[in-house]
């Protein structure tokens, strides 16, 4: 009955890398839709997170998944867990 499958209790978010200019850090823009409480219209809300990128492998435009972790620095408490979709090169 008791399966030994472990699931992570850490929060995960999916967003787009908007900056990779810092060493071992990327800035990830996470957007989500929220219904306005009075008017009922869906509005796009966004927030930027600094995430740890140990190998400097992610580029601007990549769609990545970030996972909550212990604080790495003053502004970093997230780490990039995987690449969802690479940026298109035009």
UniProtKB/Swiss-Prot annotation:
GO BP terms in the entry: translation
Keywords: Ribonucleoprotein, Ribosomal protein, RNA-binding, rRNA-binding
Entry's Gene Ontology molecular function annotations: rRNA binding; structural constituent of ribosome
Function: One of the primary rRNA binding proteins, it binds specifically to the 5'-end of 16S ribosomal RNA.
Subunit architecture: Part of the 30S ribosomal subunit.
HAMAP family linked to this entry: Ribosomal_uS17_B
Protein name in UniProt: Small ribosomal subunit protein uS17
């Amino acid at each position: 009955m008791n399966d030994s499958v472990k699931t992570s209790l850490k929060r995960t978010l999916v967003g787009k890398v908007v900056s990779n200019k810092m060493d071992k850090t990327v800035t990830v823009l996470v957007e989500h839709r929220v219904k306005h409480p009075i008017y009922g219209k869906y509005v796009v809300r966004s927030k930027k997170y600094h995430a740890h990128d140990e190998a400097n492998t992610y580029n601007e435009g990549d769609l990545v998944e970030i996972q909550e972790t212990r604080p790495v620095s003053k502004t970093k408490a997230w780490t990039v867990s995987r690449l969802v979709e690479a940026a298109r090169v035009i």
